[in-house]
Amino acid sequence: MAIPGRQYGLILPKKTQPLNRVLQKPSVFGNDSDDDEASVSESLQREAAKKQAMRQTKLEIQKALAEDSTVYEYDSIYDEMQKKKEENNPKLLMGKDRKPKYIHNLLKAVEIRKKEQEKRMEKKIQREREMEKGEFDDKEAFVTSAYKKKLEERAEEEEREKRAAALEARLDVTKQKDLSGFYRHLLNQAVGEEAVPKSSFREARTVIKEEKLRGYPDETNSENRPQQNCALQSGVEEAEENPDADSDSEESCDDGERGDHKVKSRGEEDTGASTKYLKHHKNHTHSRSSSEEGGLSTKYHSRSSQSRGHEHKGGQHQDRQSRDQESCHKDRSHREEKSSHRHREASHKDHHWKRHEHEDKPKGRGQGERQDREWKREKYSSREQEKDRQWNDHDRYSEKEKKGKEKEEHRKARRERCEDGAKYRERKKPEGSGQSSERHRDRRESSPRPRPEDDLLDQERSSKARNTEKDKGEQGKPPRSETSLATKHRLTEERPEKGSQPERPPEAVSKFAKRSNEETVMSARDRYLARQMARINAKTYIEKEDD
């Protein structure tokens, strides 16, 4: 370093107070020669002082350079300081490294336009030469080396453009006539001349596996997702090394997830699955009932419009019975699938518990943990049994509701058929017909089979009479066999009486009106008797009753 008392570099002068110079009075008797001698001596002294100062400064500079060689390198030190500032300030670096966005594209476009302009000029010169028709062919043509070089560059550019166009035509699918290019790429990849693309079948399969794991409701929660992703990545690496080990890695991942899962999450999953299944079942039954109602309404409409063709009605009834049978088969198969699904879940969970016990034995865990697991298993099995009981109750209740709906629909259809028959008979009956009761009786006896409309009316009346008798009291009620014989006799007696009385149209009953207790059949035996009466009335011949 420099001497501590010395100061090197840029030294700013300090402000000093001006000295009061003492002016010497010139002597009156002085000579000019004295003045000249004084001025010479002063100049010599001044020069000597300057030389002394120069010598002193040189010595000081030499000493400073000997101590530190970079004392007077002001420019290099300043440049280093500026570089440090730029390095510390990232904005300045970003400003320097930033490249223009559009100028390089503009420059390329300018070059392309220049080449096109040169081509146009060449074509123009060529046309002028053709117009001259060989007038100046004998003259000597002066061609510079720069022009020759330009012509060579132009020829190379044209050759490059032709090659690029041919390659594009070869790779373009719309310009290819066959699959030769595709097969050529396949061959090159098989031989090894071309690199196989990254998106291979193996990577696509791993992506599909990951999506499958995300889709199911019995997966782990979002807390266990990172562990699952790590296991997936390790499984993918093992699959790449050994392609046959995909299934093994999947099974190990599933085992780890199941082992880490807690009993609480299991219960939540079971409740979620049960609620989802209930919603699905409700939607299924609702859609089925709505479709059945729609089918029944259309069926009844067609039946009322086509009431004249009784054979057509019989065919529709058979179709309806076949559809009901199909729906019953579908419901039975659906219930069987549900029960099998529940049994499968229970067996899967039992297998899960057994596997846990089998893993705990070789690890040598304590007896307390095994007892806790057995207690949890018993609790879980009791919960499963309760859930199965609830499912069975729900299925039984839905079957009862369905049967009740079918019975009500059957009764509505029968009542509408009766009304349609009465309207049809009223329409067909001629106005002012004074036919006697004897003619009616003769026609009835001569006809091979009774009219189905009359039979339906008789059936309705008999059911009403039976209900009224039942309401009166069961104390003086005769046995059921006697009542059935009495109702048969009454029906046979009412038939001839019906011909004598003028028929009155039945009152139109609204479909949505509430039925009274007289119209409802109370017991299974009454329903059986009603069916027997309907069968007897529908027969084409009259059976002789055995007294």
Swiss-Prot record:
Where does the protein principally reside?
A: nucleus
* Any one of the GO BP annotations: mRNA processing
Q: Does the keyword Transmembrane apply?
A: no
Q: Where does it localize?
A: Nucleus; Nucleus speckle
Q: Name one Pfam family in it.
A: NSRP1_N
One GO cellular component term noted in the UniProt record for this chain: nuclear speck
Please describe what this protein does: RNA-binding protein that mediates pre-mRNA alternative splicing regulation.
The record's region (Disordered) falls at 25-51, 188-523
Q: Where is the composition biased (Basic and acidic residues)?
A: 200-217, 255-269, 308-339, 356-480, 490-506
Q: Return the Acidic residues bias intervals.
A: 237-254
- Cross-linked residues for Glycyl lysine isopeptide (Lys-Gly) (interchain with G-Cter in SUMO2) are K198, K209, K279
> Whom does it interact with, and what assembly results?
Interacts (via C-terminus) with SRSF1. Interacts (via C-terminus) with SRSF2.
Q: Where is the composition biased (Polar residues)?
A: 223-232
Coiled-coil ranges per the record?
103-177, 376-417
Region called Necessary for alternative splicing activity, residue ranges: 105-169
InterPro entries registered for this protein in UniProt:
NRP1_C (IPR046850), Nsrp1 (IPR042816), NSRP1_N (IPR018612)
**What name does this protein carry?**
Nuclear speckle splicing regulatory protein 1
Task: Provide the GO MF annotations for this entry.
Answer: mRNA binding
Q: Does the keyword Repeat apply?
A: no
Q: What residues bear N6-acetyllysine in this entry?
A: K276
Q: Which family does it belong to?
A: Belongs to the NSRP1 family.
Where Phosphoserine occurs, residue numbers? Answer: S27, S33, S247, S252, S447
UniProt KW keywords: Acetylation, Coiled coil, Isopeptide bond, mRNA processing, mRNA splicing, Nucleus, Phosphoprotein, RNA-binding, Ubl conjugation
Annotated Basic residues bias: 277-287, 340-355
